[in-house]
């Protein structure tokens, strides 16, 4: 019985508190008045039990409301609502395009770095050394110095080609004219060419039929004696 009575008492007390709050809110609304001022509509109230009165200015109008432990009641005029809606429409939306662009630039820079690092070796350098040496053997003798400065693999292949190919075959000669006067002199003297011999070129001897017969006769004499 004691527990039952205690439960009934708590229920009655809570219902009484709710009724008092309802009456206080209704009385506050009845006592509140609307006044039109130069700044707009102002809501005033004589009730002081909710807290101190404060005034809120929004655009064309100001609203006075109470702040405390109870609920807040704010009444906004139609003009203020229209001004708020217009300001909300006119507020520019800040787009997040700049950080996106910066991230895209970073990704592109990374891609270019990766592509440049992957394309450091050309197709010529990717060839095996035997084929690379054969390709370099078809180059002029004067271009070997510049090929040594390209890369390590081409430098090694050019050194091998120099020892194997260019030491036994004569490369192409290049015409050298010091100035335009030398060019005219050469053209006048029945196109005599002033050529530069390539360095370390082997000597070529011209064999005639008489020289070959002499060599063969000496060989035959040595055999039959």
Curated annotation (Swiss-Prot):
The answer to whether the entry has keyword Isomerase is no
The UniProt entry, under Pfam families, shows: F-box
**Annotated pathway:** Protein modification; protein ubiquitination
Domain annotation F-box: ranges:
121-169
Q: Which GO terms describe its cellular component?
A: nucleus
Query: What keywords are assigned to this protein?
Result: Nucleus, Ubl conjugation pathway
Q: Where in the cell is it found?
A: Nucleus
- Gene Ontology process terms (BP): protein ubiquitination
Read off the PROSITE patterns from this record.
FBOX
Top-rank taxon, per record: Eukaryota
Q: How does it assemble?
A: Part of a SCF (ASK-cullin-F-box) protein ligase complex. Interacts with SKP1A/ASK1 and SPK1B/ASK2.
Q: What is known of its domains?
A: The F-box is necessary for the interaction with ASK proteins.
Protein function: Component of SCF(ASK-cullin-F-box) E3 ubiquitin ligase complexes, which may mediate the ubiquitination and subsequent proteasomal degradation of target proteins.
Q: What is this protein called?
A: F-box protein SKIP27
Q: Which organism is this protein's natural source?
A: Arabidopsis thaliana (Mouse-ear cress)
């Amino acid at each position: 019985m004691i527990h039952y009575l205690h439960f009934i008492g708590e229920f009655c007390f809570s219902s009484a508190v709710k009724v008092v709050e309802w009456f206080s809110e209704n009385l506050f609304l009845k006592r509140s008045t609307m006044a039109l001022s130069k700044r707009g509509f102002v809501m005033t109230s004589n009730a002081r039990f909710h807290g101190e009165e404060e005034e809120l200015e929004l655009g064309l109008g100001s609203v006075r409301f109470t702040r405390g432990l109870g609920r807040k009641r704010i009444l906004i005029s139609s003009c203020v609502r229209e001004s708020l809606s217009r300001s909300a429409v006119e507020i520019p939306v800040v787009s997040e395009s700049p950080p996106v662009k910066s991230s895209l630039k970073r990704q592109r820079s990374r891609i270019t770095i990766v592509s440049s690092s992957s394309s450091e070796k050309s197709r010529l350098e990717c060839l095996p050394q035997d084929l690379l040496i054969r390709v370099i053997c078809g180059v002029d003798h004067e271009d070997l110095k510049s090929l040594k400065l390209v890369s390590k693999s081409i430098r090694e292949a050019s050194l091998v080609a120099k020892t194997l190919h260019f030491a036994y075959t004569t490369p192409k000669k290049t015409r050298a004219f010091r100035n335009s006067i030398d060019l005219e002199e050469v053209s006048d003297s029945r196109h005599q060419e002033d050529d530069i011999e390539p360095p370390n070129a082997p000597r070529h001897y011209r064999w005639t039929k008489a020289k070959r017969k002499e060599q063969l006769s000496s060989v035959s004499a040595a055999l039959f004696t």
